């Protein structure tokens, strides 16, 4: 089923590739696929490294890691309650499922027995929202940070932001800065604040995520007696500054789309656009009228508050704040649609898809990876997202409306994505 932006969701709410780790771990493809050689098993190996958190190294190193841990996987397969190695993984339940698959494959491999894999293997986007925003404006530096460009090892924008935060803290002459440096500023502190940028993340949300990360990182051993509010507030200012310095084009796109949404709202119109697949996306954010009703329940009078949409009204604040995340979601939905269509044309019919993580059988992963890159490149070569929004606004809004033109594009060659091993990996 689809939402209004074209994003796709399984009808089943629990057993779904889009659910939590323990839910994904229970899923396998009904149709098995033979693993005939080491090439067919390559993405099964890489998937194992990924779910264990060994995903900041090259694909070759991930594959080597999996073969170095065959004995561990076999031990887990034989007795997962005693051998708890799988519990050390970033995604422990998917790691357990992988251990079972990897152990059976390697046991059979020794004797030349055929092995049919049923395990979905996934290739994950690198901060996918920022990948789309960087592609829209052809931002070369932003694109490099989120792996739109080829590189020998994966780039990590969360680490880039963390390094910039450290530089900013070193410039401060305050005890709080020294305390934070002593605790250590790492990618875990900056990951979630960076991830929410394409979705209109706020400074308040940034502070909350930093607070949670600090609590997890150093609860019971910190200079603040476990009072993490002040250090989180202090650090969030530098994280927010670093994000704005590292992620420039993304903010340009977001600010532009927000301004167009405000123009629509001022004229009492809902902001709308067509995605590259041709789907019309319309934001429907009405102003709300607050009402109160009284009713009887078990002999008592109960008063309930509720909100009712006001017809023919537009909530300008929600329209503006929702514009950027809804646009990005509509674009990742379009990219997924094009990818699936291309894969089906190649004979692939089994998918485990999230909007920033595409999965299928290990032997089919090379084809899936090729087609998802082709789909992304073709989508942005053939569709100028902001120009289309501008043209639509000029047509839809009142004559004489001063519609701002889109920001200028950078020098990124979008076809470089075709050769980027870590665009999705």
Predicted feature descriptions by range:
Residues 1-425:
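Conserved catalytic core of nucleotide polymerization and phosphodiester-bond processing enzymes
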